[in-house]
């Protein structure tokens, strides 16, 4: 005698097997609920017949600089892929946007710093704030000594490698870089 639990279990196994065979024939299997998805996952445990290779995305990202995804897999100059006008347009538009944003943020930052300095001077002259200049001088001397101790003439290897990548990109893509700097200056002026 078969119980309802056994019937349900065998029904689930038949459903999963039917779906697995349908998907293996190339037909699209539709999953209508989470329960069916869980059933399919449970039924397919250990039924993989091929060897799968894992892909380490962190290692791949280290080997693929961002400009390769933007300009293509070739690391060669973009002059081989795009016309002169296209390169100048790409560089000019991105440079203009960057310059415009830099100008707006720079104005806001300069206003905040200048306004804060103005308010501090006003508060100092009206007597709300008293500055202990001897203590400021003593703290500045301490900071100078600490900077002299930590001073190193060597550039870290990470910074050096990134700088080399940037220089290489600039050399290979002169038109895009020139367009960017021209657009940046236009964006700063507008």
UniProtKB/Swiss-Prot annotation:
Q: Cite a single GO BP annotation.
A: autophagy of mitochondrion
Q: How is it placed in the membrane, per its record?
A: Multi-pass membrane protein
What family does this chain come from, according to its entry? Belongs to the FUN14 family.
Membrane-spanning intervals of the chain: 82-102, 109-129, 166-186
Q: Does the keyword Repressor apply?
A: no
Q: What is the originating organism of this protein?
A: Bos taurus (Bovine)
What does the UniProt entry say about where the protein is found?
Answer: Mitochondrion outer membrane; Nucleus
Q: Which residues lie on this side of the membrane: Cytoplasmic?
A: 1-81, 130-165
Record keywords:
Membrane, Mitochondrion, Mitochondrion outer membrane, Nucleus, Phosphoprotein, Transcription, Transcription regulation, Transmembrane, Transmembrane helix
Q: Which domain of life is it from?
A: Eukaryota
Report what the protein is called.
FUN14 domain-containing protein 2
A single Gene Ontology MF term assigned here is: phosphatidylinositol-3,4,5-trisphosphate binding
Residues with the modification Phosphoserine, per the entry, are: 10, 54, 152
Biased composition annotated in UniProt, kind: Polar residues? 1-13
- GO CC annotation: mitochondrial outer membrane; nucleus
- Where do the record's region annotations for Disordered lie? 1-31
Topological domain spans for side Mitochondrial intermembrane: 103-108, 187-190
Q: Which PANTHER family match?
A: FUN14 DOMAIN CONTAINING, FUN14 DOMAIN-CONTAINING PROTEIN 2
What's the stated role of this polypeptide? Binds directly and specifically 1,2-Diacyl-sn-glycero-3-phospho-(1'-myo-inositol-3',4',5'-bisphosphate) (PIP3) leading to the recruitment of PIP3 to mitochondria and may play a role in the regulation of the platelet activation via AKT/GSK3B/cGMP signaling pathways. May act as transcription factor that regulates SREBP1 (isoform SREBP-1C) expression in order to modulate triglyceride (TG) homeostasis in hepatocytes.
């Amino acid at each position: 005698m078969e119980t309802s639990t056994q019937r349900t279990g065998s029904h689930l196994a038949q459903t999963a097997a039917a779906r697995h065979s349908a998907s293996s024939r190339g037909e699209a299997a539709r999953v209508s609920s989470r329960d069916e998805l869980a059933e399919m996952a449970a039924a397919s445990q250990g039924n993989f017949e091929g060897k799968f290779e894992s892909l380490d995305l962190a290692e791949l990202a280290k080997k693929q600089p961002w400009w390769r995804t933007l300009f293509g897999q070739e690391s060669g100059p973009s002059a081989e892929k795009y016309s002169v006008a296209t390169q100048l347009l790409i560089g000019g538009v991105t440079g203009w946007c960057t310059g415009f944003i830099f100008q707006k943020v720079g104005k806001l930052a300069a206003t905040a710093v200048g306004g804060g300095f103005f308010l501090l001077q006003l508060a100092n002259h009206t007597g709300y704030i008293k500055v202990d200049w001897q203590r400021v001088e003593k703290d500045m001397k301490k900071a100078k000594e600490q900077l002299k101790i930590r001073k190193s003439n060597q550039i870290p290897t990470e910074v050096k490698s990134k700088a080399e990548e940037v220089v290489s990109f600039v050399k290979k893509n002169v038109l895009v870089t020139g367009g960017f700097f021209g657009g940046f200056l236009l964006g700063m002026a507008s």
